[in-house]
Amino acid sequence: MTVLIHVLGSDIPHHNHTVLRFFNDTLAATGEHAREFMVAGEDNGFTESCPALSLRFYGSKKALAQAVIAKAKANRRQRFFFHGQFNISLWLALLSGGIKPAQFYWHIWGADLYEVSNGLKFRLFYPLRRIAQGRVGGVFATRGDLSYFARQHPGVRGELLYFPTRMDPSLNAMAKERQRAGKLTILVGNSGDRSNQHIAALRAVYQQFGDTVNVVVPMGYPANNQAYIDEVRQAGLALFSAENLQILSEKMEFDAYLALLRQCDLGYFIFARQQGIGTLCLLIQADIPCVLNRDNPFWQDMAEQHLPVLFTTDDLNEQVVREAQRQLASVDKSGITFFSPNYLQPWHNALRIAAGEAE
């Protein structure tokens, strides 16, 4: 039997760390198909912190792709589970036959599915990638992303799977730490990545609420982002008074980030694709509603779980936000499919499918 190999095809430290720790702590003990990894980027202590995994690191996305292609050609029974991916060379290999469809199983993370960049290189590449994505052996994704993908590639198998957000189920029914009344605190974006469209989001919040709310913008990740942070701060201060705007430029530890989220009343996310599911989960767990773009298909996952969904096109005010909070508080969080530990069983199923051990 050939052991399934997992591929983290791009150097995205935060996401890669979450996946590796999840596999090390939760899945590795269940079988050999959850232990072999090829990772783009440096070790950064992963080998030491994930002793249950066999990890191989590659200095660039291209070097990793070349190694994957070589393995795929050497043994056509070798299967790969691509997590996220974001690696042009791998898509081209699937398109050219370097990697066969039966060898390629893909967990969609969002950005690699949608065509949102206006850069010329990306606009030229998107049609090729779209063709390649129709050749994968199978995909795993959120309900909304599965629906989006199926419209383009109805013949490709799709299975429900959620990113393994770090969550403490004991907090699902936690007592409220403060009375939700008075001035609203709104979280804008889930990181400092430009895909959050922070400036447009700040303008949208101002248009809805004016300078009457506290606005918190977490921008400590990714690193080396000071010029963009300054740009967002300048745009924010043109709209909001200094005491109402908090731009967080330092990376936060998980517990500090969790505490920050729980001080908010509303999350505001205008990106037109699925992303930031970890932050969304933590907000929902704390009975904090989220405002989504109607083009972000994750609203389908939320609606399926009977969670209130607010849209950027809605007329928003404090009364609407408080009612959404009340509705969230009445939901039994233990039954939400994309919460821990409910997302575990689909991961076991995904491993068996990708390894060729399940029909």
Swiss-Prot record:
Task: List the Gene Ontology MF annotations in alphabetical order.
Answer: 4-acetamido-4,6-dideoxy-D-galactose transferase activity; fucosyltransferase activity
State where the protein is found: Cell inner membrane
- Keyword line: Cell inner membrane, Cell membrane, Glycosyltransferase, Membrane, Transferase
Q: Which top EC class applies here? A: transferase
Q: Name one GO biological process term.
A: fucosylation
Highest taxon of source: Bacteria
Membrane topology summary: Peripheral membrane protein
Q: Name one Pfam family in it.
A: Glyco_transf_56
The pathway that the record names for this protein is: Bacterial outer membrane biogenesis; enterobacterial common antigen biosynthesis
* EC number(s) from the headed UniProt entry: 2.4.1.325
Question: GO CC annotation: what is one?
Answer: plasma membrane
Reaction equations catalysed: beta-D-ManNAcA-(1->4)-alpha-D-GlcNAc-di-trans,octa-cis-undecaprenyl diphosphate + dTDP-4-acetamido-4,6-dideoxy-alpha-D-galactose = alpha-D-FucNAc4-(1->4)-beta-D-ManNAcA-(1->4)-D-GlcNAc-undecaprenyl diphosphate + dTDP + H(+)
Keyword Zinc-finger assigned to the entry: answer is no
Q: Which family does it belong to?
A: Belongs to the glycosyltransferase 56 family.
Q: What does this protein do?
A: Catalyzes the synthesis of Und-PP-GlcNAc-ManNAcA-Fuc4NAc (Lipid III), the third lipid-linked intermediate involved in ECA synthesis.
| Protein name in the entry | TDP-N-acetylfucosamine:lipid II N-acetylfucosaminyltransferase
> What gene, per UniProt, encodes this protein?
wecF
